[in-house]
Amino acid sequence: MASVLPAAPAAEKKRLLPSFDRCAWVALAALVLVFVGQYFAFGYHICPDTRKYIAFSPRVNFLYPWFLAALRGVFGEESYLSWCAIVQNVFLAWSVFSLCEYLRRQLDLSNAGYLGVTFTAGACFLLQLVFTGNHILASNVIFSEGLAYPLYILLIKYTFAAWRYPSLKNALLAALFSFLLIGARGQLSWTLLVVLALGIRAMRAASRSRAVSVAAGAALAAAVFLLCSALNTASNAYKHGFGQNATMGRSVVLATAIWCSEPEDAALFPEDSPERGFLEDVNAFIDKEGCAARCAPEGLIDRFYYFTDLYDTLKDSLSTFMLEYTPLENATAFSVRIALRLAAHRPLSLLRHTSMNFLAGAVRSVAIFSPAFIVLAAVFYLVTLVTALVCRKKGVLVLESRLMLAALLLTLLNCWFVSLGVFALSRYMFYSLPLLYLAAEILFIRLLLLLFKKKPAET
């Protein structure tokens, strides 16, 4: 399936836009027909977060609300949500095609290999219809992942390009997609680390000193972060009359710290302070709803699902309690103060919680979170990691092993970042799944072909 063709010319490999031949047109047409076709079969879906994006909630990042507003302006109130799902499905089809076509040229895939990896990438998304709890494809849902998934796939493509062919242009393109991703999903702020690494690599390739390269990479990552923050603030100022960054990040960090706390931790703050009053009210709410780690069962699986069931109950209550003790413009500083104090006081509880969340995220990046799949996921990660490292050490399948290691590293970063705040919801972890399976398919089929090719020569 992933057999090798004669190497493409160097200029063709460096080309970022897709090259079209009959096979490429077939792949693109098939992806568009499948994704758009399933939309017409199932229609679009409204989820609990949809109203936040439509209403320009100050809690969410700027990109998706403005995307919906633009579609509403073009297609009208009656049909813009339908067109939103259509656009998301076409964009997803294009992003899958663009990545697979790029890998085709980089890895010199045969037509069969190219169509095989395209099928694998597309099938990973279609499996959402079977394995997610609501049996809905994300590109049909009116929420930010409808844009973020294809943007992430394109970030992978440009990251691979910027690492293999380091240049300022390629680093800037990767930074652009990181900016768009963070603009859609604050959870993906960890991609700033990718921007930092690519900026450093581009500068080192241009024979800059290590210090200059690090400074330039840091400046590029900082520029992406500051631009996202500025646009979030400007969007809230325009829509709500007050300029502040998206508040979702503040909410999840505080909710995690409180989830891991104990009732007596309110005494960490002076008796008449607003922080203490806030925590006492929240603890009374927790006693009623049971939404804290101290109320959770002990078993790993049960404990995780208890967290996922009640985390939003705690998080969504915090803003209501907070506004009784501090004005909205001071809410961020108020939240950070409490979160840092609680986290510093309960480091082991926080470590236990984030470790559980990390494990669940790692499993959900490749499978369903259950006892059997924990073992299978561990085997998958171990086998792919060892195989990629051995291939790299022996100097065989270097690009294939590099792709596999990159997939594992990006998964690690996503799991780590999610574990610190929001829980490892399936849709937060799905970003890594298509790349992991795509990279594993290419690596192991190429390895098998290499082994079978060597056998006749040895006998």
Predicted features along the sequence, with ranges:
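Multi-pass, polyprenyl lipid-linked donor-dependent membrane glycosyltransferases
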Residues: V87, L127-T159, L180-T191, Y428-L433
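Juxtamembrane membrane-water interface segments immediately following transmembrane helices
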Residues: Y44-P48, K52-I54, A218-S319
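Extracytoplasmic catalytic/substrate-binding loops of multi-pass membrane glycan-assembly enzymes
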Residues: G37-L71, F75-S79, Q244-N245, A331, ...
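Loop-to-helix entry region of an early transmembrane alpha helix in multi-pass inner-membrane enzymes
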Residues: G76-F97, A138-V141
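Transmembrane-helix motifs of polytopic, lipid-linked glycan transferases
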Residues: I86-N111, P150-Y158
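Membrane-interface alpha helices of multi-pass inner-membrane proteins
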Residues: A171-R185, A221-N232
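Membrane-interface transmembrane helices that cradle and orient dolichyl/undecaprenyl
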Residues: I153-A171, M203
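Lumenal/periplasmic acceptor-binding loop at the mouth of the active site in multi-pass
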Residues: P274-A388
